[in-house]
């Protein structure tokens, strides 16, 4: 009796461990319609209204690496506060990380398959919108870079070496592209800041020039009034 119970326990443990090792793939939907997962990389700019929040969803497998970069390029309105709050959540809704700054990055490994949520909140600005540039996505390392392939074909040593070199080059180019996008964020933000300072200096210089000209006209007017002597006649003489 005891050996049978022992064997049954081993079978149950094996089933549980195999179930845990499987990927948490989402449901494909009703019928034969496949689930739309979108692209793996995205970069674009978005305008968030005062006190507003914008959220995005990115699909990722549990063996990937997620990256998220943002840069507040400029403010549109009465306020000049460029700080925003960025958050990342798991497919189950749990908070992964929060970033509250003008620019920032959120990077993490994906431990479950599903749609990860990214949110940007402009809660500190009640009277100004912010333009934010985003760059986020997911990439995979190793043999699981292409999840559409069920199994890889066996190649000879020469083709394997070429494939490995190509994969490394592709991996390095991808990370160069990431750093280039982050540098482009900074460049665009600096351009908007330079343009804002240029307009500020021009308007301030124009205002100061008008004040100087107006003060000169007023001084000339009062000086003329000070030295202006009225014409006197025999009947109209100034009294002592």
UniProtKB/Swiss-Prot annotation:
Its main location: endoplasmic reticulum. Residues 1-21 form the signal peptide. Residues 53-138 form the GOLD domain. GO terms for cellular component: COPII-coated ER to Golgi transport vesicle; endoplasmic reticulum; endoplasmic reticulum membrane; endoplasmic reticulum-Golgi intermediate compartment; Golgi apparatus. It is a single-pass type I membrane protein. Pfam families: EMP24_GP25L. The chain crosses the membrane at residues 201-223. It is found in: Endoplasmic reticulum membrane. One of its GO terms (biological process) is endoplasmic reticulum to Golgi vesicle-mediated transport. Glycans are attached at residues 107, 156. InterPro entries: Emp24-like (IPR015720), GOLD_dom (IPR009038). Residues 22-200 are lumenal. It comes from the Eukaryota. Residues 224-240 are cytoplasmic. Keywords: Endoplasmic reticulum, Glycoprotein, Membrane, Signal, Transmembrane, Transmembrane helix. Belongs to the EMP24/GP25L family. This is Transmembrane emp24 domain-containing protein 6. The gene is TMED6.
């Amino acid at each position: 009796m005891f050996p049978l119970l022992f064997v049954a326990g081993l079978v149950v443990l094996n089933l549980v461990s195999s179930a845990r090792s499987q990927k948490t793939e989402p449901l494909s939907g009703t019928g034969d319609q496949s689930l739309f997962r979108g692209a793996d990389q995205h970069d674009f700019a978005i305008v968030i209204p005062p006190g507003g929040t914008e959220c995005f969803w990115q699909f990722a497998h549990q063996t990937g690496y997620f990256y998220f970069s943002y840069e507040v390029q400029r403010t549109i309105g009465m306020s000049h506060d460029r700080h925003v709050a960025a958050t990342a959540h798991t497919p189950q809704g749990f908070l992964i990380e929060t970033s509250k700054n003008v620019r920032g990055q959120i990077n993490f490994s994906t431990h479950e398959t599903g749609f990860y949520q990214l949110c940007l909140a402009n809660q500190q600005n009640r009277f100004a919108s912010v333009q934010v540039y985003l760059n986020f996505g997911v990439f995979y390392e190793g043999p699981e870079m292409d999840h559409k392939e069920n199994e890889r074909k066996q190649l000879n040593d020469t083709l394997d070496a070429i494939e490995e070199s190509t994969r490394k080059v592709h991996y390095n180019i991808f990370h160069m592209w990431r750093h280039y996008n982050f540098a482009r964020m900074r460049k665009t933000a600096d351009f908007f800041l330079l343009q804002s300072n240029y307009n500020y200096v021009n308007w301030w210089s124009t205002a100061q020039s008008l004040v100087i000209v107006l003060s000169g006209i007023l001084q000339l007017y009062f000086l003329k009034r000070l030295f202006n002597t009225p014409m006197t006649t025999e009947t109209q003489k100034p009294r002592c």
